[in-house]
């Protein structure tokens, strides 16, 4: 087995070990969960505000009620939180928690270190 294949298998084995103790399990439940994570983290990394309504609209092939359920669950699990601005108290922005940012950055670092 070549090194790249071995590294990739070890990576996924480690991800499976973490799956019930981290956000891995939650964001891999469905493509919608994973897409939400990517949208929120992309907005965070680009220093952009992403409103809950924008997120619901951008989630591919996910109904608005289902999107709302996923968002609420992510907030309950402290992966994300909602923030209001002083300009418009009706508009809520979704932001990643510090703990999730750290976990996501570790995930990216591990992915970058895989040799292909």
Where are these regions (language model features)?
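Amphipathic alpha-helical dimerization/coiled-coil segments
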Residues: 19, 105-116
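A short, conserved structural fragment
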Residues: 75-85
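Phosphate-/nucleic-acid-contacting segments
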Residues: 53, 60-64, 88-92
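Short acidic, hydrophobic short linear motifs in intrinsically disordered regions
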Residues: 46-58
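Short, cationic-aromatic polyanion-contact patches
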Residues: 85-108
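Short helix-to-turn junction characteristic of helix-turn-helix DNA-binding domains
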Residues: 40-44
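Short alpha-helical segments that sit at the start of domains
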Residues: 8-39
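Short amphipathic alpha-helical interaction segments
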Residues: 61-76
